[in-house]
Amino acid sequence: MNRTTNLVYAGTFAGTLLALSLWSLKGAAGFSTADNTPVLNGKLALAFEKHYDEEFPIKKLGTNLWAALDYTLFGEGRPGVVIGANQWLFSDEEFKPTAAASQNITDNQALIQGVRETLARNNVQLVMAILPAKARLYPENFGEQQPASLHEQLYQNFRRIVADAGIQAPDLLGPLQQAKAGGQVFLRTDTHWTPYGAQVVAGQLATTIKPIGVLPESGNVYVTETLPGGPHKGDLTNFLPLDPLFEELLPPPDQLAKHNTRQQEESAPAGDDLFAETQVPVALVGTSYSADERWNFAGALRQALGSDLVNFAEDGRGPLLPMLKFLQSEDFKKSPPRLVIWEFPERYLPMAYDLSEFDADWIAQLKAAGRQDKQLADNTATNQGARH
């Protein structure tokens, strides 16, 4: 009996291996290279090895299988995602501790204050949009994992830092929490917010900005059209390599409608001044929350402010690098806007940044200006406290 069982196991294994090997030949059949690819120096062999490795089914099977085991048995994905409850996924950047967080916060605080000083010298008003973490807004959908203590007061501490620096930064947490009753403000399987969440933030920013009086009366009216959308594969599912073999285990995709904001009507320049200023008065700088048109944050801001804007946000670069790039740009140097809106997710404050693409002396000057500004603010606060 044991001999028969062993033979069955051996035969099954050999048959499976043979079948997978034959299946893998399909990928080899599709291999092709340029006619002039040299053979003797090994480039042809390396090209075939790379192609075969990508097409080899056992590799894909192993990847899918281990991902399925981690996900179903342990509730885990690849580094980058935290599995929550109710089919929710979170970025692990909102949960894990950050190395050298305290020093990073100090350095980034100096840079933020240096940015404010640079803008102020050019008569540019800065308003920051500090975005609360998705995890802060949806703690009811946590799984077993909880955010590290670093994140507990990060949003409140960030707002205090910018307030001490004299930077306008309206509270966005409260309005987003209230807006949850009307719909999702963040996508379930994605790092990013929904167009609805972006609209809520745009409205709150406009409430802060309009009384400042920094924007000219344009009379422009913007309207947003909502178009049929469809399933949205969230970026956090990329850390769950379950498809194609175990795709049914993935959380169901979010449904994402398309939003398009356009100017409804144009107003003529005031009076008879044919040379009235046509410069766009607002610059938006930030991350993929602002850069990605699917969330329509730039459009929502245009509608809420009644003003056009130029979007300098970039995808995959964090909030600091696009801002530093903007300050170095000819657009800013030759024609600075009246207002800069800086979208800055809270989770980026304790992170370290590679600033090697910028001149080291300029970065040092920016930090020094920021630290000097902080010291002046601290001394002012101390003197005011002494008077009382």
Swiss-Prot record:
Signal peptide (UniProt feature, chain positions): 1-29
Cellular-component GO terms for this entry: periplasmic space; plasma membrane
GO MF annotations in UniProt: acyltransferase activity
Active site (record annotation): D190, H192, S288
Membrane association type: Peripheral membrane protein
InterPro entries for this protein: AlgJ, ALGX/ALGJ_SGNH-like
GO biological process, any: alginic acid biosynthetic process
Keywords: Acyltransferase, Alginate biosynthesis, Cell inner membrane, Cell membrane, Membrane, Periplasm, Signal, Transferase
Annotated localization: Cell inner membrane; Periplasm
Name of the top EC class for this enzyme: transferase
Main subcellular location of this protein, as a coarse class: membrane
Pathway this chain belongs to: Glycan biosynthesis; alginate biosynthesis
Pfam families tied to this protein: ALGX
Keyword Transferase: yes
EC number(s) stated in the UniProt entry for this protein: 2.3.1.-
Function: Together with AlgI and AlgF, forms an inner membrane complex which probably interacts with the alginate polymerization-transport complex and adds acetyl groups at the O-2 and O-3 positions of mannuronate residues. Acetylation of alginate increases cyst resistance to desiccation.
Family the entry assigns: Belongs to the AlgJ family.
Protein name per Swiss-Prot or TrEMBL: Probable alginate O-acetylase AlgJ
Taxonomic source organism: Azotobacter vinelandii
Lineage, uppermost ranks: Bacteria, Pseudomonadati, Pseudomonadota, Gammaproteobacteria, Pseudomonadales
